[in-house]
């Protein structure tokens, strides 16, 4: 992946909006219209890897993760936890999230890494509280998530995976309340109780989705404030700009840059390219969100953008379940960040970007 990914996206939208990548063995899709079409048409572009001859767990449609399923299986499994992530449900957590954010920001020292000092802790503690994860286990849960996001499979992963399997099995053995973990514990799939593997896979997905995106969003918000001092002043003066600012950050610096696993369920011609049944497709959200055909002045960060139907959280049946929670965390975080730092100026020489083409954000972020 080129260092300047946004110039690369711009070139690919111009010369090859739908291109076959010989290195990855997949079709790369870069323009908004085609990415949106794929997200909205699961009957053509499936999330089920069995269309490519791969199996999530050896049998089609029975994998532990609903992100590798299509409806009705996807809906059946997703709906187990979906009520907890509705905007009306998430709003009830506001006061608790404010407390977590306030505690973290008060401990953040001048010159300290913003990512490890705040941006990691906020979403990890929020999702852990929602799931009922003991405080003593949260660091391990985060490490587990990092291994999976980074697609690292080594002795360290094997060790932590065995530990987490045993720990999760233990937690599920006595979960019978009204919290998310208890509801998953009692969950049914095709009227059959979930297996231990399915329960663990479900929780793993919620942990990953509940921390990585928000951590990167928080860091990218700080970057956007630093790069746009005029906008920083507007946001400081008027909280009415908060939501517009967050949505523009999601568009401009999308935390998830691409989704690598869609599979053609049938032969289909996409933007003049013949896609064959079983072909794998990667959809580049970060490119779609800067498409000149969809957004006015897409390379400009505009807090007053009128038409901002970005795809940072996806679209359609697989739209990010935790999007309302991420937005609420970002809004609460933005308030506390602005109050903590009278002037936000990122030290780009000292800060470090993540080395993972799938996600966009900082591994370390320092302010002067």
Regions of interest found by a model, annotated:
Residues 1-368:
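Cytochrome P450
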